[in-house]
Regions:
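Conserved N-terminal catalytic/coupling substructures associated with nucleotide/phosphate chemistry
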Residues: 1-154
């Protein structure tokens, strides 16, 4: 998985996120922007997709135009609870909170490529990341590949 501006996760700062937002790229294979109104269901779909493919980042409190809108409905506890309650198995993830000069809170959720796929949502669906979107996997060959990847770990 790539890093934001080539920074290791523990060294990531707000300025690195701001530089990412200034770049010409929109949402990509590794980055998903979500505003504060995003539903828990959509967050879980994105996390499932990232964990089932190559990992990635959700930048929460940032709209599709890469404007910082901030978060009032989401906090670290809600993010953790949503992930713990709605995905099986639990993927490897971490959350960082940043506060802008304008006092807007944003969260960066880092999702690792999973070692024990498939990562299944609480409604029984399995997602994958394709280009800049997350989609349910309906192809039996792709599902078989995920289960095979899991078996390789044991």
């Amino acid at each position: 998985m790539i890093n934001i501006n080539d920074k290791q996760w523990d060294k990531l700062r707000l300025r690195d996120v701001e530089v990412l937002l200034e770049q010409d790229d929109d949402e990509t294979f590794f980055f998903e922007y979500k505003n504060d109104d995003v539903s828990p269901k959509k967050i879980i779909e994105e996390i499932s997709a990232f964990a089932n493919t190559y990992g990635g980042y959700i930048l929460l409190g940032i709209d599709d135009n890469k404007n910082i809108s901030g978060c009032t409905k989401w906090n670290e506890q809600r993010i953790h609870a949503t992930i713990h309650d709605c995905l099986t198995p639990l993927p490897i993830f971490d959350v960082k909170k940043f506060v802008t000069k304008e006092k807007e809170k944003i969260f960066v959720i880092r999702i690792e490529q999973g070692d024990i796929p498939p990562y299944i949502t609480n409604n029984g669906k399995i997602y994958e990341r394709v280009s800049s979107g997350s989609f349910p996997i309906k192809d039996s060959t792709k599902l078989t590949q995920l289960f095979y990847r899991k078996e390789e770990q044991y």
